[in-house]
């Protein structure tokens, strides 16, 4: 069951709009090729895309879109062509060309709400519900991703500000990082136990040099004994 305004007449004095109402693809194409505006409106603000979509004429919808019809156009009540749809293929075409499934008209009604009011078939309702669910999930993923991006940017900005306020700290961190890398490479090349042995030899040499220079053995109490 497609959606048509109850008080509407099926007649109009605009040839292109009448062709869309009648589902006359050939005449619609001829008019568009002759220069008719694909976005021309009727007295309610509806374009040919609204009228063709309401009647499930997906071929004419595709034709209008090819000639530049605006899929986002709304009538004077804020309805897009999707608000008037009652056919699966027409809905799929409009959504694939940029129409949001959760868009509201001036009364706050979405295409799904209007479809339920009109009593369209269950396949259409299920499709609209599925598309709305996908839209919500996509929005949640997008919001989560944006939040993570903002948090990362704030963290990087804070680190950059800290580095600018403490330039010596940044330089010191660079030197420390370079030393750490060099030390790790040295240990890997020489081997842990050889490095340990080298450190022990250096320590013993240091003790020997200290004794040679001062004549005092380190760690030995050389205070003279008191004679009673």
Swiss-Prot record:
Keyword Membrane: yes
One GO location term (cellular component): membrane
Transmembrane segments: 195-215
Bilayer topology term: Single-pass membrane protein
Coiled-coil residue windows: none
SUPFAM superfamilies given in the database record: Ankyrin repeat
Keyword presence, Aminoacyl-tRNA synthetase: no
Keywords associated with the record: ANK repeat, Membrane, Repeat, Transmembrane, Transmembrane helix
Cited SMART domains: ANK (SM00248)
InterPro entries xrefs: Ankyrin_rpt, Ankyrin_rpt-contain_sf
ANK repeats: 11-40, 44-74, 77-103, 107-138
Alphabetized Pfam families for the sequence: Ank_2 (PF12796)
Location(s), subcellular: Membrane
Primary localization class, coarse: membrane
Name used for this protein in its record: Ankyrin repeat domain-containing protein 46
Natural source organism: Mus musculus (Mouse)
Organism lineage: Eukaryota, Metazoa, Chordata, Craniata, Vertebrata
Gene: Ankrd46
């Amino acid at each position: 069951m497609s959606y048509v305004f109850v008080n509407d007449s099926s007649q109009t004095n605009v040839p292109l709009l009448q062709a869309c109402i009648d589902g006359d693809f050939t005449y619609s194409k001829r008019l568009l090729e002759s220069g008719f505006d694909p976005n021309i409106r009727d007295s309610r603000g509806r374009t040919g895309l609204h009228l063709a979509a309401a009647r499930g004429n997906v071929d004419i919808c595709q034709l209008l879109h090819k000639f530049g019809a605006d899929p986002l156009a709304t009538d004077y009540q804020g309805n897009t062509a999707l608000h008037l749809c009652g056919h699966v293929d027409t809905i799929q075409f409009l959504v694939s060309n940029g129409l949001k499934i959760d868009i509201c008209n001036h009364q706050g009604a979405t295409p799904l709400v209007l479809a339920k009011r009109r009593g369209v078939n269950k396949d259409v309702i299920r499709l609209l519900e599925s598309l709305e669910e996908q839209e919500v999930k996509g929005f949640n993923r997008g919001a989560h991703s944006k939040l993570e991006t903002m948090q990362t940017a704030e963290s990087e900005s804070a680190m950059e500000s800290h580095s600018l306020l403490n330039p010596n700290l940044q330089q010191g961190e660079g030197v420390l990082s370079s030393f750490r890398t060099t030390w790790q490479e040295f240990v890997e090349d020489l081997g842990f136990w050889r490095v340990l042995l080298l450190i022990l030899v250096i320590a013993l040499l240091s003790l020997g040099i200290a004794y040679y220079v001062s004549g005092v053995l380190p760690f030995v109490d050389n205070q003279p004994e008191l004679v009673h």
